Each structure stands twice: as C-alpha cells, then as structure tokens.
UniProtKB/Swiss-Prot annotation:
Organism annotation: Saccharolobus solfataricus (strain ATCC 35092 / DSM 1617 / JCM 11322 / P2)
UniProt protein name: Carbamoyl phosphate synthase small chain
Active site positions, chain numbering: 258, 343, 345
Family in the record: Belongs to the CarA family.
Pfam families for the chain: CPSase_sm_chain, GATase
EC category name: ligase
Summary of subunit composition and partner proteins: Composed of two chains; the small (or glutamine) chain promotes the hydrolysis of glutamine to ammonia, which is used by the large (or ammonia) chain to synthesize carbamoyl phosphate. Tetramer of heterodimers (alpha,beta)4.
Length: 367
C-alpha cells in the first residue's frame, strides 16, 4: 500500500541511502537504527521508553494489521501501552497495512501522525538488518518528502553520548496506592507492564525521578526498591550509579530490570559494554543457573554484561543467554539484590519469567 505515493528516505551513517514511501508524520528525525524481530506487539514496542533516541526497524514483513487500541488504565497504570506516547524517533517497515480488528481505534499511520513520528515503508528491511547484524548499530536519518543535502551534519552527535533518561524520567513523584508494602521505583523510563506487575502483587508504589538522591528515596521508608528499565548508555549515569551504591548500605531489597540491571552492575563494581546490535525480541532464551531451566523472555537492550569476567564481585550469575553467553541476571551473595537484563513482565512476549516479581515480593515481605 503506497499512501499518497509520497517518498520517504532512510540515510545511514555509513553512506547507505534507502528510498521508500512515507507514512505517519512528515519531517526529519535522527536516531540510532536498531531492529526487533518480534512478530507482534508493535503498540507496546513503539511506546517502550527504552527505544527513546532510536529509529526502529520491525523485521516482520506486515505491520499495522490490528491497528491501535484506546488506552486503558488501572490505578493510573496503562494496561495495554508501555507509556503515554510513542517513544521511537521513527519507524521502518517492509509493508504497512490498514487494520481489521474489533478494538482498533486508530490506524498505525494515524497514530504516527498524531504523535509527530515519521515512518518509511516499502523498503528492503532484510537488507538493512543484515547490514546492522554485520557491522553493528549505526546512526541514521529518517526523512519524508525531501532529500537532505548534507546528512553528516545531522549525525555529529552519537546515541552513546546522550543521557536519554532526561526525556523519559518523570519530573516529580507519582503515586500508585495499594494495600501492600510501599516500594520506590527509581523511574528511568519505566514500562507500564513492570508497574502493573508490581501493582498486581499488592505493592503501593511511588515512582520517583531517576535524579533523586538516596536520602530522598529513603524518606519514603520503602520496604523495597526497583531500578527500572530506560534508554541510553548506562555508563553516562553517574548520579544513578552513585545513588544505587548509597542505597546498598541500607540493605533494603532491590530489584534491577534492564537499565536497572546495568546500573546495579556498575554500582557494584562490574562492567557494562556496548553490544554489536543488541537483543530486541520477544523470544530470547535465558537459562536460570540454579535449576538449568530455559525460559523464553522479552529483551530490549543494546548494552550488557558481555562476559562472566565482567560481573561484579560478590555476585553470581542468575541467568545467561545460551545464544551468545551474555549475562542476563545477577544475584548478590551477601545483600538482598537481584537483577534481570530481560523483561520479566514481557508486554509484548511470554509470561515465563513473571515469577521474578514473586521472588522480589518474597524478599520484601518475607513470605
């Protein structure tokens, strides 16, 4: 389907120029070009704050066929979106189509337009993904209806050099009251699926900006602390790493997820490195070291613990990926700290590892 036959373009920093057709909003956006192999869940993926600053390629050839539903909330938590708005800078797909589903409120094209996000379709996504898989992620420009004379001037600032949590973290605390123990979520750009997983286990939740100091967090007298997912390079987050290090002294149970896992690793003395093209999919295997069980899990990260030699002292490997042997979770041997690089809440994806939230609840409540 060629919407109005308007041209759209993707420029890659290696000089590759790709021409397709434009849909969504008009304009120019810059970002790191990454891909997900997820076959569904584009609503959740596009609203995942971990994608802030990135242009997303969806490898599944047909996108948009079930449309975009209306937002649904429970206690201020979205139950079918991962944040209030689209987070990606742009979207690249092979084919875009109109929806046929009973609960569709908008087409994908209408949704992108309403949130000022450009898209390009009718391009060879397989070729682009093979290039990224071979040479690694790279910066790119997505543009509609116009060609860019000098793309290099748009690509001077690299993704790794920007703290994107400044765009995804809340500006002030947000409360989600419940009947259970109070926990603090250090919100670097949390997926609402994580919030919902915690809320359904009875926790009263206060989300605080990720710039909050340890002393401010302790003022809430939390029984547990969660460091959330979020976008960007964790090695830039000196304040958050310092905050985690100081919170460790209180011996309060801590759960780190995705970026939170990376912050924990750095705060405890480990190393986080850039991956060649990352893990972005809803069918990634992880093996739990204690039981040797394999779980299928949802991933969205471009940084990680690449080798077992990079784990912090006094921690042991909780999960690892059998495809590339990157480390997918840690347990501290002396402190009540657990982390997962993957997303136990899924959304989208399988629910194999939602029990991680139950383990954290046991750490907090003692039962």
């Amino acid at each position: 389907m060629k919407l109005e036959n308007k041209k759209g373009y993707l420029y890659l920093e290696d000089g590759t120029f790709i021409e397709g057709y434009s849909f969504g909003a008009k304009g120019i956006k810059v970002g790191e070009v990454v891909f997900t192999t997820s076959m569904n869940g584009y609503v959740e993926s596009l609203t995942d704050p971990s994608y802030k600053g990135q242009i997303l390629i969806i490898t599944h050839p047909l996108v948009g066929n079930y449309g975009v539903p209306e937002k649904k909330y429970e206690q201020g938590i979205l139950t079918n979106f991962e944040s209030e708005r689209i987070q990606v800078e742009g979207l690249i797909v092979a084919e875009h189509t109109y929806p046929s589903k009973w609960n569709s409120a908008l087409t994908l094209d209408e949704w992108l337009k309403s949130e000022n996000v450009p898209g390009v379709f009718d391009v060879d996504t397989r070729m682009i993904v093979k290039k990224i898989r071979t040479y690694g992620t790279m910066m790119g420009i997505i543009a509609s209806e116009l060609e860019i004379d000098d793309p290099r001037k748009y690509l001077e600032k690299k993704y790794d050099e920007i703290d994107f949590t400044q765009f995804t973290s809340p500006k002030s605390p947000i409360f989600h009251p419940n009947t259970g123990d109070m926990i603090v979520v250090v919100d670097c750009g949390i997926k609402h699926g994580i919030l919902y997983g915690l809320y359904k286990r009875g926790f009263s939740i206060v989300r605080v900006p990720c710039s909050f100091s340890a002393s401010k967090i302790i003022e809430y007298n939390p029984k547990g602390i969660v460091f959330s997912n979020g976008p960007g390079n964790p090695n830039l987050l000196e304040n958050q790493i310092k905050t985690f290090s100081e919170l460790v002294e209180y011996k309060i149970p801590i759960l780190g997820i995705c970026l939170g896992h990376q912050i924990a690793t750095l705060a405890l003395g480990g190393k986080i490195k850039k991956m060649k093209f990352g893990h972005r999919a809803i069918n990634k295997p992880v093996i739990e070291s204690n039981s040797n069980k394999c779980y299928i899990s949802t991933h969205n990260h471009g940084y990680g613990i690449i080798s077992k030699n990079d784990i912090p002292p006094n921690t042991k490997i909780w999960f690892y990926n059998p495809d590339d042997y990157t480390i997918e979770g840690l347990i501290h041997e002396k402190l009540p700290i657990i982390t997962t690089q993957f997303h136990p809440e899924a959304r989208p994806g399988p629910w194999d590892t939602t029990w991680v939230f139950d383990k954290f609840r046991t750490m907090v409540t003692g039962k």
